[in-house]
Swiss-Prot record:
It comes from the Bacteria. GO terms for cellular component: plasma membrane. The keyword Cell membrane applies. It is found in: Cell membrane. The chain crosses the membrane at residues 30-50, 96-116, 128-148, 176-196, 234-254, 283-303. Residues 88-303 form the ABC transmembrane type-1 domain. This is Probable ABC transporter permease protein MG188 homolog. Keywords: Cell membrane, Membrane, Transmembrane, Transmembrane helix, Transport. It holds the Pfam family BPD_transp_1. Probably part of a binding-protein-dependent transport system. Probably responsible for the translocation of the substrate across the membrane.
């Protein structure tokens, strides 16, 4: 019986390859990739090329359909429009001012949350600061309309001032821009706090233990351990804030009335594009879209290369300091 069992025992099955090691024909993964490829082509590439075509064409005669010519005349006319210049000013200043304020405030709040040692309290504060992100945008806009109201607004009552934030009636005023900044920073704070606090909590605690043994103070640990460890997260958030800053669309603060936004100095590039598309002036809308795209790309490149330049300068300074110490020894 024992010999029979040995003879008929099950043979070991050969080791199977993992799913990433198996040879698969080309068409199977390509078919899975086709929906995403088709969506990107239809809703990204095609609109982009149509925008290029509209932006670089202008009508010599508005009464003739076949009078469109290729050139830069639309861009020249675009920069001569006061509404576009106003929107360009507000969009640029919003992105320049809101970016550092949002990042710095989010880092400070996230640091406070991380240093709360009780897990229950930590999760509670994360939830509190994330609530604005999941709150209805309409409800938030209505709340800020009442907060920024010139006659009975909470902000004016707290500081005992009478600033017309959203209803000054002046095109060149900066009051509307400050109101848009307050609204935008508060709205973007929730997501940034959640992401940065999660990144801080994922830093290896061994690094802090070693730093404590070396006598490093908490502030030094923050700048030498925490910030370098969450650098990829900060770069990701900077990219999102750059795109969001240039594409600010504050029409909800003006009760959905774009003309009221322009009249009170609250116009932006995206609001200008919205007006031109509604008026079926696609050439100006396409040119403004290309200007917005170029500004966003240039702004992002300047910031990213600027951070790399700062890091390189810090490395050179530290290297020079170490070499000086070694030479003294």
């Amino acid at each position: 019986m024992f010999k029979w069992l040995l003879k008929h025992r099950s043979k070991p099955t050969p080791l199977e390859l993992g799913i990433f090691d198996q040879k698969v024909s080309f068409w199977k993964p390509f078919l899975l990739f086709c929906p995403a490829l088709l969506t990107t082509f239809l809703f990204t590439l095609v609109p982009f090329f149509l925008t290029l075509q509209k932006g670089f064409s202008h009508n010599e005669d508005i009464y003739r359909v076949d009078s469109q010519q290729f050139g830069f005349q639309t861009f020249a006319n675009l920069f001569s429009e006061s509404n576009f210049i106003l929107g360009l000013r507000n969009s640029f200043l919003y992105s320049i001012i809101s970016l550092p304020l949002t990042i710095v405030l989010a880092i400070i709040i996230s640091s406070a949350i991380v240093f709360v040692y009780r897990k229950l309290a930590r999760g509670f504060w994360q939830t509190v600061f994330f609530l604005p992100y999941v709150t209805s945008g309409v409800a938030v806009s209505i709340a800020f309309i009442y907060i920024l109201d010139s006659s009975s607004g909470i902000l004016n009552n707290i500081f005992h001032v009478n600033i017309k934030w959203l209803d000054s009636g002046e095109r060149d005023t900066f009051n509307a821009l400050w109101g848009i900044l307050i609204f935008g920073i508060w709205k973007n704070m929730a997501f940034n706090v959640l992401v940065i606090s999660t990144a801080m909590l994922s830093v290896d605690p061994t690094l802090y233990k070693v730093a404590n043994l070396d006598g490093a103070k908490p502030i030094r640990q923050f700048f030498k351990i925490t910030l370098p460890s969450i650098r990829p997260t900060l770069i990701f958030l900077l990219t999102l804030l750059i795109l969001g800053g240039m594409q600010v669309f504050p029409i909800s603060l003006f009760n959905g009335n774009d003309s009221e936004a322009v009249t009170n100095g609250g116009s932006t590039i995206l609001l200008y594009i919205f007006q031109k598309i509604r008026d079926q002036n696609n050439n100006f809308a396409g040119a403004a879209t290309l200007v917005l795209f170029i500004l966003g790309v240039c702004y992002g490149l300047v910031l990213r290369n600027g951070f790399r330049l700062i890091e390189w300068a810090q490395w050179k300074i530290k290297r020079h300091y170490v070499q000086t110490k070694l030479n003294l020894v």
